[in-house]
């Protein structure tokens, strides 16, 4: 049978004046008890030593238990607290030392301390409650939070460490100075929650943790929306991140699964995988990223299957030794490159569509920089659809370019391999090699070029096999300077000015065309570079006129006036 006790600040027949008095009597009897507390303020510390239920009979907020310093409630036995306001300073306001503790429709105000601290082996449930300023800490304990509000925590709003397990459902977390939810060596599930205005990552999985996030909204955070580091695992499903510095970040060996998420208005990056981070990302949407929608760097190695990027600066950037595989990619309406692979990075892109971007794929770096694209369409590109520079290697298979300045180009010492690719409606040409680059194209089709079909200059090498070059306004192919190569089994058709213009260093075996084929040396190389050495002032070794010079200045203003006689001053 459950014993019943009444507490009233005014006292009364069979009523206790303090809650501690009622708790003491319940502990002495050793029976389950219900303690009904009348409205009022109770400046005392409570210790639960037997199974008990504390109820504010006047409803939530009618009973305020406050201590100027130290703990307010220490629970050492199964307990339920309903409707109380617990206010403490400089200590754990609520501590669960043994058994299970449930707080319902309650409010906890923690000034310079922990709001709720669950010790190893205990269990705490927080339901329909509010926590101000302090944090909910599980150290080797189990916790469940339902429909609660956490506001202005001085550090982490909720933290689970040392093998603890936390479930947070349908709650709101706002204004935390550090993280909204922190997991360090434990497990956490965050579902149906809103997290906003956190000073660091809203949800963060630390070393060897497991984090599951589903159906959440993360907005207006100073750092990452969701972060996984140090070999942590877990998943993120159907979650939206808005106005974070980075939407989702993965680093240092972490390997989450992310599905059906939307990352909007991220100030730096949408997805950031770096420092050996991995991860599998499926059906992700990134819009309006301030710097890069998807960034992979410093050994990051994600797998992305289904990603739509719209608006913002750059699309996918794989740099500094990063690597990744990207499938079912859509990139639209950017102000910079759709795909970028630099500095010993490797990337494979399959089933790609790029629309209305300044450039498609850009690669640059040493010989360890490699990119592959298969089954792609790049259209309405302002500059080059594909550009390979440095010593990078690029392989394109079944890539179609529609309406671009240049379809495929390689310069410096880069290598570009084309298989069954096509270009239509280009301005300058279909494929280009310059510098000392090498371009090999098999099964290439170029149609409707306002310039050339293919061309090479400098000392580059251009090899074209089985190509169809149709309706190119200037000509099918041009080899200028000391460039070399071959046109094998190729056809040049249409009403262009020339079929082929070459320098005599090209193998034309199997060329089919009715247009003129002209051998002529064409030079495009610039003149010698002139180097001026300025020491304390300019040194003139010949006549100089019409020149303005300034040195040893931080700021200079130049004005030029044309006189009536045509002279300038």
Spans of model-derived segments:
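A general structural motif
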Residues: 2, 30-32, 78, 484
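Right-handed parallel beta-helix
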Residues: 58, 78-87, 100-110, 123-134, ...
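Right-handed parallel beta-helix/beta-spiral solenoid domain characteristic of secreted/periplasmic
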Residues: 2, 10-17, 52-94
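Extended, small-residue-rich solenoid/repeat segments and analogous flexible loops
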Residues: 119, 127-128, 237, 528-538
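Short active-site-proximal "capping" loops at secondary-structure junctions
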Residues: 40-43, 53
